[in-house]
Amino acid sequence: MKKYLLGIGLILALIACKQNVSSLDEKNSVSVDVPGGMKVLVSKEKNKDGKYDLMATVDNVDLKGTSDKNNGSGILEGVKADKSKVKLTVADDLSKTTLEVLKEDGTVVSRKVTSKDKSTTEAKFNEKGELSEKTMTRANGTTLEYSQMTNEDNAAKAVETLKNGIKFEGNLASGKTAVEIKEGTVTLKREIDKNGKVTVSLNDTASGSKKTASWQESTSTLTISANSKKTKDLVFLTNGTITVQNYDSAGTKLEGSAAEIKKLDELKNALR
């Protein structure tokens, strides 16, 4: 009898080692940090199906899943009180996470992709599951917001917000973002392609003497000229700020030091 009970105890112990994700804790799992400030618990042992159990809690919803890997990657799912579904997908190399909320019938409501560099893309969908809004936050904290979207490549409204709250407004057409700021007859435009490449230009509709500008991609510098003389450089830094520096009266060399533009009015003043 003792041997029998011992055998039963051993079997139960083995089952406990192979139990499902609902019982994961700090003793039988490892916590893995994934992009988005989330943690995924990964079982130390494989379950009866030869996979690692996964568990995470997102917005008070318990998500569960399994994976062939023990690094935290995989797909986890859970259900909210209103029966909508939450799905978390962690990339194999842990480089990004995709968090989705879906209706009970599977229609997507929202999606947020977070990369390791903390850049994010958040998308919202209408009742039919069609893309309607999208916000992209770069690693430097600047944003691109799209609304009134008809598909992934077209939006009636686009707003880019750089550091210091400086906003450029425009639209998204055929995958290219075109946003601008106007001051009098001068328009400062930023064009952003699908790969994130930025081109800055200036257009002046004045009837008399017009300002012109040349863009140097390698230094992200827009050199503005008037009456065939260079007047100032606008530099769009990688941290999301803009600086301005004036040329001497001859327009041959920069003088003083570059100053950070901290207000929209300061940028508009630089365009005058």
UniProtKB/Swiss-Prot annotation:
Name listed for the protein in its UniProt record: Outer surface protein A
Membrane topology: Lipid-anchor
Primary localization: membrane
Highest taxon of the lineage: Bacteria
Keyword tags: Cell outer membrane, Lipoprotein, Membrane, Palmitate, Plasmid, Signal
Record InterPro entries: OM_lipoprot_Borrelia, OM_lipoprot_dom_sf
Residue numbers with lipid attached (S-diacylglycerol cysteine): 17
Example GO biological process: adhesion of symbiont to host cell surface via host glycoprotein
Recorded family membership: Belongs to the OspA lipoprotein family.
Subcellular location field: Cell outer membrane; Cell surface
GO cellular component entries: cell outer membrane; cell surface
Pfam families associated with the record: Lipoprotein_1
Lipid-modified sites (N-palmitoyl cysteine): 17
Signal peptide as annotated in the record: 1-16
Keyword Signal belongs to the record: yes
PROSITE patterns to which the protein is assigned, alphabetical: PROKAR_LIPOPROTEIN (PS51257)
